[in-house]
Amino acid sequence: KLKWGTNMKVKVAAKINLMLDILKRLDNGYHSLFMIMQSVDLYDTIMVEENTENRSIIKCDTEGVPCNEKNIAYKCANAFFKACNIENQGITIEIEKNIPMAAGTAGGSADGAGVLYCLNKIYKTNLTTTELAEIGATVGADIPFSLTGGTAIALNTGNVIAPVKDLPECYIV
């Protein structure tokens, strides 16, 4: 059991696709992809803290963001608890949005990745980034990349990440 007052706050980055190639359609309806992704200097802030409700609560400062079980951050919290066989004794996830919604910049996935990172630290489960990415991939294709950031090649449905040398600082229009 956690002690009351346990909380953590992180900034999570948006991403852009520098390249996306659809290789083939998979039997499950998804597509096998080859992508080059880059995190960018646009961030949401995620705070995870205990509550006394024995359930996950989502709070967000932006209209239109679902504050219920449809939220990717909420889904990631549930996936974490299930994968780690931990009873959710109550957490509040507060999202401060700066990454635009539905813009293809992985705002929801970044939020979910931030929740996984925070819960791993708060609950001291010591999962590796690869293990967190496996949990995240059950929720969304961009979550594994959002856990690592930087510049990376993403394969399959986005669940296989291979970091590459960072791009030089530049402007993208």
Residue spans for each PLM region:
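N-terminal beta-alpha supersecondary unit
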Residues: K9-Q89
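Short pre-catalytic strand/loop immediately N-terminal to key active-site residues, enriched for Gly-Thr
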Residues: F34, I91-G104
